[in-house]
């Protein structure tokens, strides 16, 4: 979205999501004079699946690095959950590659119980769904929101397999990579990356998040003393979906103050 001559900003969704997960935020940001690159990460949405099943943090970092190196200016990166992990590791391990970071409900330390809930949801229906209504019901059960009647929006998150059933629009092999990395090992890596950050950084947390705790926020802010922080009321881990207007306003306010 927006004029390619404008400063670039890359949106990276979370694991198991697609580029459509940002609601109206990406389009709103484009109207503020930014060139928005809204990405389907490897193995998600319209992007290819990895033949070798490489959905490690290293793999996603290579992808973001390749995107940043193609742009004429260092981009701002807005990353939710897995997208935020990618952004943090990329800039922390390659200082100066990115202009600024907006991390959405992710810190080096995450809550194992919340991560387990995500993985349970992602692996719950390997056989798929008969109807889009069933998909909508599953999403509502996970998010705690009222079931959507916008089935076209739901359709963007699934594909139909050979038997005509609806399955999620991401490679199931991704779960194996997530389990293989280990939360503790990844937390050590990300905290080291955080300590290296000098780029302007905004951490956005969903107040009701079961992924990012108050302790996780405190430890991150101690490591990144210049980071700004906002706690979004009535939002869970899915901040952009739960409170899209508040989230969009926070992103726009932050990026419009960048030098």
Regions found by a protein language model. Give the residues of each.
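Conserved hydrolase catalytic core segment
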Residues: 74-112
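Helix-rich cap/lid subdomain of alpha/beta-hydrolase
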Residues: 109-170
């Amino acid at each position: 979205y927006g004029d390619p001559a404008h400063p670039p900003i890359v949106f990276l969704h979370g694991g198991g999501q697609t580029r459509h997960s940002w609601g109206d935020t990406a389009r709103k940001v484009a109207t503020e004079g930014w060139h928005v690159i809204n990405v389907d990460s490897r193995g998600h949405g319209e992007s290819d699946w990895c033949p070798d099943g490489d959905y490690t943090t290293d793999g996603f970092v290579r992808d973001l690095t390749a995107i940043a190196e193609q742009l004429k200016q260092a981009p701002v990166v807005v990353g939710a959950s897995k997208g935020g992990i990618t952004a943090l590791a990329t800039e922390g391990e390659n200082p100066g590659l990115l202009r600024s970071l907006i991390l959405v409900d992710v810190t080096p330390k995450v809550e194992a119980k919340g991560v387990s809930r995500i993985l349970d949801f992602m692996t719950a229906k390997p056989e798929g769904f008969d109807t889009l209504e069933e998909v909508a019901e599953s999403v509502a059960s996970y998010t705690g929101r009222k079931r959507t009647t916008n089935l076209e929006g739901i359709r963007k998150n699934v594909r139909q397999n050979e038997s005509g059933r609806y399955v999620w629009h991401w490679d199931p092999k991704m779960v194996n990579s997530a389990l293989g990395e280990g939360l503790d090992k990844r937390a050590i890596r990300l905290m080291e990356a955080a300590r290296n950050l000098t780029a302007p950084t905004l951490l956005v947390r969903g107040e009701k998040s079961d992924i990012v705790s108050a302790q996780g926020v405190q430890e991150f802010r101690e490591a990144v003393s210049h980071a700004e922080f906002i706690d979004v009321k009535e939002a869970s881990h899915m901040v952009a979906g739960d409170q899209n207007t508040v989230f969009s306003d926070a992103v726009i306010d932050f990026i419009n103050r960048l030098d």
